[in-house]
Amino acid sequence: MPAESTFDIVSDFERQELVNAIDQARREVATRYDLKDTKTEIVLSEKELTITTESEMHLAAVRDLVQTKALRRNLSIKIFKFGPVQEVSGGRVRQVATLQRGIPEDVAKKLAKLIRDHFPKVQPRIQGDALRVGSKSRDELQAVIRLVKERQDEFDIPLQFTNYR
């Protein structure tokens, strides 16, 4: 009888690719005609991205620019969870985006229930901010991957599959 095969469902992104996308966005903001004199700041910290500029119109343009640059570097735009627009001193506006990393517990429970409902012989286990899925049949695991990829739009986080053993 074969040993159990497993894989992990995670939500993560390549940090260096995000840094590169933000650098490209900063360069484009500095050279683009409609954004050149807006004193726009794009600040990337460990867990969030802050965009500060002169008006909500410029803010929307910079936000779209950042998302476009991220998409071109194969990053999902679901990693950005944008908060409300805030007024700051000098008539400027700011928006903070939290960077999504790891699967929140409520999403992990929904994923585990989805997998259990469709595949009773497969065991999904929540391990911190990842979901480990195990089964004796590799075919069932591949079917689970197909199911989760098809239903990925139901979850507001990007999902990847790693450690397939």
Swiss-Prot record:
Assigned protein family: Belongs to the YajQ family.
Organism: Roseiflexus castenholzii (strain DSM 13941 / HLO8)
HAMAP family the UniProt entry points to: YajQ
Name of the molecule in the record: Nucleotide-binding protein Rcas_1283
Gene Ontology, cellular component aspect: cytosol
GO function terms (MF aspect): nucleotide binding
Key words of the record: Nucleotide-binding
Entry function: Nucleotide-binding protein.
Source organism phylogeny: Bacteria, Bacillati, Chloroflexota, Chloroflexia, Chloroflexales
Pfam families associated with the record: DUF520
PANTHER family in the record: UPF0234 PROTEIN YAJQ (PTHR30476:SF0)
Listed InterPro entries: DUF520 (IPR007551), UPF0234-like_C (IPR035571), UPF0234_N (IPR035570), YajQ-like_sf (IPR036183)
